Amino acid sequence: MVYAVYSLNKLISVGLVEKRLCITEEKNRKKTQYILKDQMFRFWYAFVPAAASSVEMGRGAVYYEKVVKPQLHNFMGKVFEEMCRYYTLREGIDGNLNCFVTEVGTWWGTETVEDVSGQKKIQSADVDIVGLAPSEKTMVVGECQFKNAKAGRDVLETLVRRSRAIPSKYRVVQYLLFSKDGFTQWYTDEAPGDVAVFSLDDLYKEGVGH
C-alpha cells in the first residue's frame, strides 16, 4: 500500500497523473479522482496495448478503422472539456466573464429529481466546469457538449438544475455553454443575459492552449 502511494505520488510529480478534487468539496476525501494528465498517454493506454498483435501482423490500419476510429469521438470529448476549462480560467482572469474567476474545476455528486410520475429520485450528476471567484464569493458554471448536433435549450436547463446541487457559499452569476457544433436558434433569440455560448471555432480563434 505504501509503495502504491509512493508510485502514485511520483507519477503526479512528473506530470503524468493528476489528483483531481471535487471543487467546493476539497475536504471530502471520498471525492478524489486520479486521472492521466497527458493526453498522449491517455490515448496510448486506451488503444495501443490491445493493438499490438494487429500492428505486428501489419494490420494496424485495419485496427484503427475497426476499433480506434469508432471510439475517437468519445475520447476527444474529454480533451474538449480540458480546453473549455482552460478557456474559462483565462477568460475569467482577463476580465471577460461576469466575475474574476481564478480557480476552475469540476464538480460531481448527486441531485434529486422528479420522474414522470412525480416521484422523487436521487441520481448522479456532474458539472463540467465550475469557475470560482473567491474574492467576490461568486462563480460561473459550464457544460461542454462534444456532439455532432447543435446544443438546444435543454442543455442549459440541465446545467441550471445541476448547479443547484453544488454545496457552495458561492453565488452563480453566469452560465457558460460550449458546443462543438454550435447552438440552436433559441440561444440567439431567447437566451437570458447571464448565458454565454462558445463553439469549437470560438476556442480555436482565441488560441486555446497558447
PLM region spans:
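Short amphipathic alpha-helical interaction segments
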Residues: 1-15
